[in-house]
Amino acid sequence: MSKNNTSETITRKPMERASKKVFFRRRKGCPLSVPNAPVIDYKNPELLIKFVSEGGRMLPSRITNVCAKKQRKLNNAIKIARILALLPFVFQAK
C-alpha cells in the first residue's frame, strides 16, 4: 500500500484583514481630581456605591477612569465602609 506522492506546489494567500478601522476613545481625566470634586470618605456611601459593581465588587480604574492615587483611597474607603456596615459586602439579587 504505497501512496502516490505528487509534488504539487500549494500557494497560500496571506490572510486578509478586515478593513475595519479601530477607533480609540479619548480617555477622560480622573473624575475625582477635578476642581469641586467630592472628597473620598468612608462616611459617604452615596459616592462609594458608584464605584462598586452590582455584585458588590470594587470596579477597576480602567472602567471608572480614576487615577491610581484616588483608586487606592477609594479601595480603602470602601473596605472601611464595609467593616462599619455602611456598605454591604454583597448586594442582594432582586
Curated annotation (Swiss-Prot):
Keywords: Ribonucleoprotein, Ribosomal protein, RNA-binding, rRNA-binding. The keyword Transcription regulation does not apply. One of its GO terms (cellular component) is cytosolic small ribosomal subunit. It comes from the Bacteria. GO terms for biological process: translation. Pfam families: Ribosomal_S18 (PF01084). Part of the 30S ribosomal subunit. Forms a tight heterodimer with protein bS6. Belongs to the bacterial ribosomal protein bS18 family. HAMAP family: Ribosomal_bS18. This is Small ribosomal subunit protein bS18.
